[in-house]
């Protein structure tokens, strides 16, 4: 299923499509996760879960029939918020607006007034993107990552 993009993304990345991801994308997603996140890459079981759990918003960015980005959004009705569970773009395609397009598409489909995410405190590039997209740091989770690095909890209040 193709997802319509705002004109900005069509003009800057004319051959990119955002599509709903499925279990058929497991191999491509695993390669992408390992390339992007290396030591933080999700296990095959985690990837299978995110691709099959019916409530998760899962979208992929495709350029020339190749998955070059992915985002998963986790609805949390009890918190009246959605969480960006993971988002990543192939290093060859970073800086071209694909991450922004995936983030916005996921926010829209989560359909909550607030969207949250966690990011490594050292990931300046991602933090910059999130801040430009309206996210603000609301908490620090100390030693959140396996190697002991802190995670920033960022939140965006959407205009609904």
Identify what each model region corresponds to:
Residues 103, 109-121, 141:
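Conserved GNAT acetyl-CoA-binding A-motif
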Residues 17, 86-88, 116-118, 153-155:
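Short aromatic/hydrophobic contact patches that present stacked aromatics
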Residues 81-85, 124-130, 135, 142:
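Conserved N-terminal glycine/acidic-rich loop preference
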Residues 9-15:
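Extreme N-terminus of proteins, especially the signal/transit-peptide cleavage junction
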């Amino acid at each position: 299923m193709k997802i319509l993009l705002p004109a900005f993304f069509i003009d800057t990345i004319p051959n990119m499509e955002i599509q709903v991801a499925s279990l058929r994308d497991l191999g491509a997603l695993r390669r992408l996760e390992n390339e992007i996140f290396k030591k933080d890459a999700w296990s095959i079981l985690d990837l299978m879960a995110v691709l099959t759990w019916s409530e998760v918003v899962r979208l992929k960015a495709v350029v020339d029939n190749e998955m070059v980005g992915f985002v998963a959004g986790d609805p949390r009705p009890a918190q009246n918020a959605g969480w960006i569970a993971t988002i990543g773009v192939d290093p060859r395609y970073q800086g071209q607006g694909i991450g922004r397009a995936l983030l916005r598409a996921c926010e829209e489909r989560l359909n909550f007034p607030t969207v949250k995410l966690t990011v490594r405190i050292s990931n300046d590039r991602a933090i910059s993107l999130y801040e430009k997209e309206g996210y603000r740091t609301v908490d620090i989770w100390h030693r959140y990552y396996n190697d002991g690095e802190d995670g920033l909890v960022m939140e965006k209040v959407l205009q609904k």
